[in-house]
Amino acid sequence: TKGPEIRTGDQHMKLITGTQVRVVSDPELKDERHLFVDYPHLTEQLGQGNHILLDSGLVKLEILENHGDSLACRVLDGGTITPKRHVNLPGISVKLPGITLSDRKDLEFALEENVDVVALSFLRNRDTVLEVREMFRERGEQIKLIAKIENQEGVDNLEEIIQVTDGIMVARGDLGIEIDMEELPQIQRKIAYLCAKYGKRLIVATQMLESMMENPVPTRAEITDIANAVFEQSDAIML
């Protein structure tokens, strides 16, 4: 599943470091100086000091002031925003359903194709897992469920999620955007410990052997990363 996603609109905008931009959640307000983000609770939940990360964290904005219908932001890390870029709101518990309409269609497809495993993205608590299990149970299926831990709320509710899933994926890409990067190793180790405690599968993902897309041999750092995953009793790594 894709899980609860937030994205920019159809705009193409160049954001220069040090300049200011207004961010809006009303598509009627978007223009060359107002960037649209498709999250209706944007101005309700965010304010001065919060950050907005765009395009998988490549562009970073700091909120200076909440104007009610828009957020005045300073561009900390600039870049060019193309249509439908991913948006992260670190530290914010987003008010979106755990399973979207698109996810339900994908889950129906999974049932029709008799898949063995489904990975659930951006899990925040156990409720979404139980909802999907019930959906499968009503159809007489027992498809394995893997929880992707990708945000702070998922980390906070880690133990309750592990208890109701068949395994955990440490999705270090989005997780490393949503939380401080230096916390990643500790969180990965905690997840490994809890998976061992409850006898659940562990998958470590993101940037494993990424250099081999261009080079014939991995870097020493990648070898060490894989070795650490093995030492943590991972059942699989995802390239």
Placement of each model-derived feature along the sequence:
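Non-catalytic helical/linker scaffolds that mediate oligomerization, partner binding
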Residues: 1-239
